[in-house]
């Protein structure tokens, strides 16, 4: 019938017709998704295909659509459409056929486009993008296609001696043998009018992860009313049972180690713990950066004091106290160089203590939960295997009862630490955070500043004690030593006792810093950076002493010997 569009284009194609090879499609920039196009970013896709979301939308968990530009038809539709074009010319009425809505399902778009001409078919099949979550299931479409890629459901429903029964079951459905409207349901599945399935809705699991509570609730509603169909023959009963088994969402019956959708509770708790861990780490790095800037200023102060003490007994026109007092800033005693040195050490220890805390401690009921899950799934596997002597109806009923009881126990006490989440996400329980390069640089800067401050302060004290005639109470020490006047603690006219207290406190602080950096000092990268920085600044570094405290400890020991 030339000049008219055939209502059933698939029926006009002969069996064995060769399909013309499809030209490779050019994926250019105009096929970027709306989100990448709005931000003027490159739309990166896996294997250059638009059948899946791009990398940016998948990472941001946003819906990836191509609404403002054209997109190519999936390969399955192109394959079917090119093999079933109408022979002959099209009518003038088909040339003026209005385009369907932008959200038309792919099957309706295919049936509408086959009634157009060759030129209009190519333009009509390039429809705007349907949301990614509303796409039909590829396995269902492959099973509906015959060996010649034809969507022929009528032959399946009437074949193998069951033609009368298939026609009777499909009384209220259309009989044209084509796939009809696909509508997304409220549960996130897709309902398809399928003639060869009982009823007119076939719910299958979507390609995206569904929340565990929603899957369990829907699954329990179906389990409570699952019939056994004992009145049917054996072959029909097995067919109906297998179809009803496919009707239920498959996600809840898999072990937790095989599907990510069963780790909803654990994923939520893990996300919150990871967010808190990341927040603590970022806060520690920020505090380390602020502390390093403060210690750098303190280092400049004690360096000026070191330069002044080097000329302490070479200038006859100025006394030592007068010279050092004018060299240093006129700040209060609690803000002097030694006071800031000890306060900076205490602040550094506090930050490193929070940085070295374990990410999270393992709860005591982890082993119990693992044993319970293993026991439940062992019963499930035993029920699935079943005994060959028992009937199919008995095995099916036993499977549903075990599954139903297992889901009830999981819903009553949801375990955020399931077996899958424990193996996949919570391997860091009880372990300290592994520092990255940013944390290593911040710790290295604070640590080296502290070492330089301690080395400079004790160099000034040692030089003063060597050049002083005696330690009589009348002799005043340089301005840096009375820095022990912290929080009201002050020793007047007792410089030797004051220096002894300073050496004891400083030794304790250095030991605490070395203990806090035990994990960091064992890192090879941190060791290499520390060695390079210390050698550039002139501090001693030996392979047996990786902390770089040799110079400071030698000066402290020398001062203690002079005070004895």
Curated annotation (Swiss-Prot):
Its main location: nucleus. Residues 182-192, 258-278 have a biased composition (Polar residues). One of its GO terms (cellular component) is nucleus. It is found in: Nucleus. Residues 33-64 bind DNA. Residues 68-93, 152-197, 252-278 are annotated as: Disordered. Keywords: DNA-binding, Metal-binding, Nucleus, Transcription, Transcription regulation, Virulence, Zinc. GO terms for molecular function: DNA binding; DNA-binding transcription factor activity, RNA polymerase II-specific; zinc ion binding. InterPro entries: Zn2-C6_fun-type_DNA-bd_sf, Zn2Cys6_DnaBD. Transcription factor that specifically regulates the expression of the gene cluster that mediates the biosynthesis of the mycotoxins phomacins, leucine-derived cytochalasans with potent actin polymerization-inhibitory activities and monocot-specific antigerminative activities. This is Phomacin cluster regulator phmR. It comes from Phaeosphaeria nodorum (strain SN15 / ATCC MYA-4574 / FGSC 10173) (Glume blotch fungus). The lineage of its organism: Eukaryota, Fungi, Dikarya, Ascomycota, Pezizomycotina.
